[in-house]
Amino acid sequence: MLTTETASNLKVLKRLDVITAECVYGMNIFKDILASLSDTFGGRNKSIQNTLRDARRTALTELRKEAYSLGANAVIGIDLDYSEISGGGKAGMLFIVASGTAVIIEQ
């Protein structure tokens, strides 16, 4: 899995398809309160950092599974996008999209 389209030591034999993986995580009210305290007093909020890390890992794992289901042995040009979805005063949701190109590389 690469964030770049090319690497000097890898030869792309075939580009299969653009692939994506999406994950949505609920950010409960307690995490929101802790985040606001961290914002007020400074410092890092480990609870939210852990949620972000879990979301990233899950999205990349799902992206890898999607690539393998197409017969790819690599993913290039990986991009991660994070968004927050909130509405109606309810606890927000973290939405992450991982995208890339499923390829077959020379082994």
Curated annotation (Swiss-Prot):
It comes from Pseudoalteromonas translucida (strain TAC 125). This is UPF0145 protein PSHAa1882. It comes from the Bacteria. Pfam families: YbjQ_1. Belongs to the UPF0145 family. The lineage of its organism: Bacteria, Pseudomonadati, Pseudomonadota, Gammaproteobacteria, Alteromonadales. InterPro entries: UPF0145_dom_sf, UPF0145_YbjQ-like.
